[in-house]
């Protein structure tokens, strides 16, 4: 194909005509394809300069080929470019600038005296036609008379703003309009000053100010300090009353006598939820819903009943939550037994069915109770007085003094215990259980831990304290040391250096000793597991005994558990939420 034919093809419009003859892309040889790929790799590695489009911009070599390649029907020259991927200017919307706005109060142009071609035939204005004219239809239009031609109206521009332009509240605002308000306030202030000056002139002419200056109170400084300010306020009260109606706004209380504005704001002395516990590992605060479900004082050891805020989880158990859960449980049970009820689909039907079920259940219990009483008797035991009367505990009002004596009402009788009280045996002055130490009960008078022992008095206390001192001295001898001399310090340093050398020699022997340590740990863990099993059996036996017949001793120990005991406790602990918990006993 000749060069003239190619130029003619490029100059022809891309309208799909049959006369258009474009050169089709030729098939590349293997050598050309290999060179092209090598050049692309070099450009990606930065060893070769990137391609440049017709605008002089670099083309990123990492852009895929299906994006960077130009279709042959768009650009037959196959020049490297990304113009076809950018927004086309003819498709972009043209928005108005931020300074453009509708013109207000535009003066009308001078009235013309001659009809202009293309103007309204009725009034003669150039801005509209006869069918859009708002004037009264004339008997003979301005086109034929040439008189009373109306001026041209101002045509407002068609503004089209972008996202920010539509939300610009100050667009089109003229700051000079605010000067009118400033001038009005300045006039009011000037009028008040002139009135005040006139009053002072009148008082000076009448002699009131001279009498006030010559008064003894004014000379000795005994005049009330607020008298002058009160006069100033009283002189301005008349002016303030004029504007009191304008100043009265919702959410405010305006007092013209005191000239103050009091805000009706709610006192916020409560603490924000997220400031109650600054520990990041404490209860989570959701800023979107402003909710803190858990108790922020959970890790602080405080009782939830004593704190002012214990989390938002209490809302889950308020209102109709419990009743709704009971209704849902009844719906599930009824569905399992063949009743077609659903809480969300048929709420009214389910509510009526649940109410009738509760009534029938109560009737069935009453019938069952009556049948048992008729068959076996025992109605007289059910007619016994309540437990409050039996234990002499009532809700009668009783008023006490500061010293504990009864002022009004009858003193309440003390509830008697089922156990014997104030029983002192074997010459003891205190009862058994008045002393507690290291998991054992005893007598407070002699610190004895044997229930049926004789009281030894202060001598027993001294013996117990001396035993503690001996134990404490044995443990504290190591901590209390005499001051050392320089020679002793030097000898200790030499010993430490020898120990370090020995440790270096024994490093290669540690591998053999590690196996021995593992065996020892295994044996300790085995013993701890056996002890934990024995403890669980002991606890199980105690729980099977009646609560009133259980012994007084406690399982509590004061010493800290070892690592093996803690590991055994974790291994033997049963978790109710564990799905495999039922298989542990097998």
UniProtKB/Swiss-Prot annotation:
Ranges annotated as biased composition (Basic and acidic residues): 20-44, 529-550, 557-578
Database matches in InterPro entries: Slu7_dom (IPR021715), Splicing_factor_SLU7 (IPR039974)
Modified residues annotated as N-acetylserine in this record: 2
GO biological processes: cellular response to heat; intracellular protein transport; mRNA splicing, via spliceosome; RNA splicing
Subcellular location: Nucleus; Nucleus speckle; Cytoplasm
ZnF bounds (CCHC-type): 118-135
Placement of sequence motif Bipartite nuclear localization signal: 129-169
GO molecular function: pre-mRNA 3'-splice site binding; zinc ion binding
Span list, region Disordered: 1-103, 206-254, 491-586
Bias-annotated ranges (Low complexity): 1-12
UniProt KW keywords: Acetylation, Cytoplasm, Isopeptide bond, Metal-binding, mRNA processing, mRNA splicing, Nucleus, Phosphoprotein, Spliceosome, Ubl conjugation, Zinc, Zinc-finger
Domain of life: Eukaryota
Compositional bias (Basic residues): 498-510
This protein's GO CC annotations: cytoplasm; nuclear speck; nucleus; spliceosomal complex
Pfam families: Slu7
Recorded coiled-coil stretches: none
Biased composition (Acidic residues): 235-248
Modification Phosphoserine occurs at: 215, 227, 235
Domain notes for this protein: The CCHC-type zinc finger is required to retain the protein within the nucleus and prevent its shuttle back to the cytoplasm via the CRM1 pathway.
Function: Required for pre-mRNA splicing as component of the spliceosome. Participates in the second catalytic step of pre-mRNA splicing, when the free hydroxyl group of exon I attacks the 3'-splice site to generate spliced mRNA and the excised lariat intron. Required for holding exon 1 properly in the spliceosome and for correct AG identification when more than one possible AG exists in 3'-splicing site region. May be involved in the activation of proximal AG. Probably also involved in alternative splicing regulation.
PANTHER family: PRE-MRNA-SPLICING FACTOR SLU7, STEP II SPLICING FACTOR SLU7
Family: Belongs to the SLU7 family.
Protein name per UniProt: Pre-mRNA-splicing factor SLU7
Organism the protein comes from: Bos taurus (Bovine)
